[in-house]
Regions:
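Short helix-capping segments at alpha-helix termini
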Residues: 36-41, 87, 111-115
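Short, acidic loop-to-helix structural element flanking the phosphoryl-transfer center
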Residues: 65-93, 127-128
Length: 177
């Protein structure tokens, strides 16, 4: 059984523990509305996405104006983390992508920081990152479960190295990004 093997559970943050994408979607709607005389909403969204992607290595993920937005846990998150903590069986680690300052502030604002043994912020989540952390934690990947909304960056890498993935999809507007 999975629960008997797992020693460490990694949680993604944005759109797994709290809503984040909705704020980006709203900002994009305002952006395309303000600039509609220069192109269609699709053209403007594509241009914005390309610019954000190009800036990501330098500026990180997301606009700094989003640093003050709420990070309200989804229903059931606190109850789930409480239950996992009370078992005493698992080390809970928050591993998320993004800007270090932004993620640290969101975890603090969410009130969930008390549940996590460690908070790790990375720019990319993939096989290498999961292997590196499994070595630091002195736990084989076969004893790690990852809970996240992105199959590509949260779930697939851990499965490929023998761990467990718990996919919680989140697409508030049916988006694909």
């Amino acid at each position: 059984m999975m629960k008997d093997k797992v020693k460490v559970i990694f949680f993604d943050a944005d759109d797994t523990l709290w809503d984040n994408q909705t704020y980006f979607d709203r900002a994009e709607e305002v952006f395309t509305e303000e600039l509609k005389e220069y192109g269609t909403a699709e053209e403007l969204s594509d241009a914005l996405y390309k610019t954000e992607s190009a800036n990501m290595p330098i500026l990180g993920y997301g606009a700094k104006s989003l640093l003050r937005l709420p990070a309200t846990p989804f229903p059931g998150v606190v109850k789930t983390l409480d239950a996992l903590e009370k078992t005493g069986r698992y080390r809970l680690i928050l591993m998320t992508k993004g800007d270090m300052l932004d993620q640290q502030n969101k975890i603090r604002r969410s009130g969930l920081d008390k549940y996590f043994y460690r908070v790790i912020v990375v720019t990319i989540k993939g096989i290498k990152e999961y292997l590196d952390i499994s070595h630091v934690e002195l736990v084989p990947s076969s004893q790690i479960a990852v809970v996240g909304n992105s199959f590509k960056s949260d779930i697939q890498p851990i499965i490929e190295i023998g761990g467990y993935g718990i996919h919680i999809p989140f697409t508030p507007c049916g988006g694909t990004r």
